[in-house]
Amino acid sequence: MTPIDAKRPLQLNDQGQLRHFLSLDGLPRELLTEILDTADSFLEVGARAVKKVPLLRGKTVCNVFFENSTRTRTTFELAAQRLSADVISLNVSTSSTSKGETLFDTLRNLEAMAADMFVVRHSDSGAAHFIAEHVCPDVAVINGGDGRHAHPTQGMLDMLTIRRHKGSFENLSVAIVGDILHSRVARSDMLALKALGCPDIRVIGPKTLIPIGIEQYGVKVYTDLTEGLKDVDVVIMLRLQRERMAGGLLPSEGEFYRLFGLTTARLAGAKPDAIVMHPGPINRGVEIESAVADGKHSVILNQVTYGIAVRMAVLSMAMSGQNTQRQLDQENAQ
């Protein structure tokens, strides 16, 4: 296994093209816009009788999910299949990692299968970055979510949802509500919104679920839902991540819903044409009431549809960036 050249930006090739997709941190606005534009072009594929394009024909994409996720894994599988790639999905519950094998050893064995791309989801922050640093240079790595750190494809599908429903980001007010502390989605959304020029990004939640120093992301912090939702264009609700919480951060789910649950009455404080989003899975009656989740403002199911197109864009762009870098390396070696 040969590490990537330390002088080269890990996510980009020498021409500034995507070769891994690990985080939205530091990626230029132009590249994020290119991902959105490419995803827009792929939405048409989903409406065809034969939902395939040959961009990744002959390539193998390996989904390595050390953490459960039905929605993310399924959309990555569909995205790769629609690009005509061969797809392998590792069932971690029956893999050698449950028998004590290290992440590094698992990586080496997967690499021996000659996959061209790994889509990695892991409960430890930085796992995808570690794999990208140590994998064979020809293999692209996509972060499907790592700990509390990042979920870049979710961030981009959220941006595509906002752009398709609201157009430009430059005059929007966006509220992110709920368990900010444990949410990799919140971090990715904040980075993307800032990079794309959104002037008013708000985070709303109890003090115990808002990270210290979050203002560095360029956001306004609210601990009152009614105040925070005033005149917003977009509301992004987050799931309470009980599995990541230590005791004492939250009195009860009922108390959270009483203070921070999105109801029809509370949504009335937002703009009349506001949209409501949620990365899923939804906890009805905890962070959102059914009348809102299923109502006219909800674009939650649209997010799922757009997610396939965004992941098609990321897979195809990263594979193209790897191919370009391989050609550059070969030319430089001559």
From Swiss-Prot:
Pathway: Pyrimidine metabolism; UMP biosynthesis via de novo pathway; (S)-dihydroorotate from bicarbonate: step 2/3. Belongs to the aspartate/ornithine carbamoyltransferase superfamily. ATCase family. SUPFAM superfamilies: Aspartate/ornithine carbamoyltransferase. Catalyzes the condensation of carbamoyl phosphate and aspartate to form carbamoyl aspartate and inorganic phosphate, the committed step in the de novo pyrimidine nucleotide biosynthesis pathway. Signal peptide: none annotated. PANTHER family: ASPARTATE CARBAMOYLTRANSFERASE, ORNITHINE CARBAMOYLTRANSFERASE, MITOCHONDRIAL. L-aspartate binds at K99, R184, R239. This is Aspartate carbamoyltransferase catalytic subunit. Keywords: Pyrimidine biosynthesis, Transferase. It is an enzyme of class 2 (transferase).
